[in-house]
Design a protein with these regions (language model features):
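Hydrophobic residues within alpha-helical transmembrane segments
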Residues: 53, 79-82, 118-121
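Alpha-helical transmembrane segments in multipass membrane proteins, preferentially the mid-helix core
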Residues: 57-68, 128-133
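Alpha-helical membrane-associated segments of multi-pass integral membrane proteins
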Residues: 13-14, 101-137
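Hydrophobic transmembrane helix segments
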Residues: 15-57
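Cytosolic juxtamembrane helix and N-cap/initiation of the first transmembrane helix
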Residues: 1-29, 132-146
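Transmembrane helix-loop junctions in multipass membrane proteins, especially transporters and channels
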Residues: 29-37, 67, 71, 96-104, ...
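Interfacial non-cytosolic loop connecting adjacent transmembrane helices
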Residues: 33-49, 90-118
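Loop-to-transmembrane helix junctions at the membrane interface
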Residues: 62-86
Length: 146
């Protein structure tokens, strides 16, 4: 029972993590950050769709094989999860710094910036929960009953 519950938790948190990451990409393309350089995705562009496709591919391919019983892919997903943690944490620190130091003008699109911050916070929390779900050791009572 524990293994099935753990596997379901990993699946659900992986899907939530993918959703939050996609939200960050889409909301970022709607924000003033989309005008910050020549290589930034703008909303509806081919680059945005390719980015979303790549993110979903990198999330869903290892997850599909994990669901088929290849549990060693949990470590590959952990590497991607770590990258997601790094991106979420750095974005949560970078956006307020840009605002405080006056390097970016967020006045017209505050809603998209707040959406990015909420999505980053959701990604951060979801990825931490993912690590707990994926690598939690069974409790002593469960071990005794087995």
């Amino acid at each position: 029972v524990r293994n099935s519950t753990s596997k379901n938790s990993v699946i659900v948190t992986t899907l939530l993590s993918a959703l939050f990451f996609c939200f960050i990409l889409v909301l970022g393309s709607l924000s003033p950050l989309a005008d910050s350089g020549p290589n930034v995705n703008t909303f509806g562009s081919t680059g945005l769709w390719l980015s979303l496709g790549m993110v979903l591919f990198l999330y869903l391919l290892p997850l599909a094989f994990y669901m088929l019983g290849m549990h060693f892919l949990k470590f590959v997903m952990a590497a991607f999860c770590s990258i997601g943690l790094l991106i979420a944490a750095s974005t949560l620190l970078l956006i307020p710094a840009l605002f405080l130091f006056g390097l970016e003008d967020f006045s017209g699109n505050l809603a998209s910036i707040i959406g990015i911050m909420i999505s980053c916070l959701g990604l951060l929390i979801t990825n931490i929960v993912w690590f707990v779900a994926a690598f939690k050791r069974p409790s002593a009572t469960v071990q005794e009953s087995v």
